[in-house]
Amino acid sequence: MIQMEVLGGSVSWPFAIPPGRSNPDGVPPRVAELSAKTTSWRLSAWRDAASNAIGIAINEQAISIDVGHIKALSVCFMRRAKGPGFVSFEARMLETRGTVVLFAADHFNEDALRWLEGNTDKLAALFGMPIAIEDCGLDY
C-alpha cells in the first residue's frame, strides 16, 4: 500500500532535491503520475509499505530511500552570517553514519524553515518515524 501527502509550498523559497540525488526509478508509478500533475513548487511525499521505502518528489525530481537504512530524519538549518545558510530535510543513515539531503533550500529563509517545521508532524506520521529539529548555528 502506498500512502501519499502533497504539501503546499511557495515559489519564493523553492526547495529542491540536490543535484545528482534524484533517482526516479524508485518512485512508484502512481506517485510519479500524481506528482507530475502538481505544480512545481508543491512537495509530494510518500511511503510504500510493499518496498519499505519513503520518498520525496518536487519539480519533476524524486528521491527514495529504504526505511531500513535510515537511523533518523531531521530538519536542519543554518542561519545566515557570512555565508548564505540553508534549510534542509535530511536522513541520517545507519551503515555509513552519513546523511542524505532529501531536499533543501540553498540559503536560509525564515518562512521556509517555518513551513518545514509546520509540516514535520505530517511527514513524521507519513514516514512512521520522528523528525528532529537541528539548529546548526550561524554560517561563518
Language-model-derived ranges and their functions:
Residues M1-Y140:
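Intrinsic disorder/low-complexity detector
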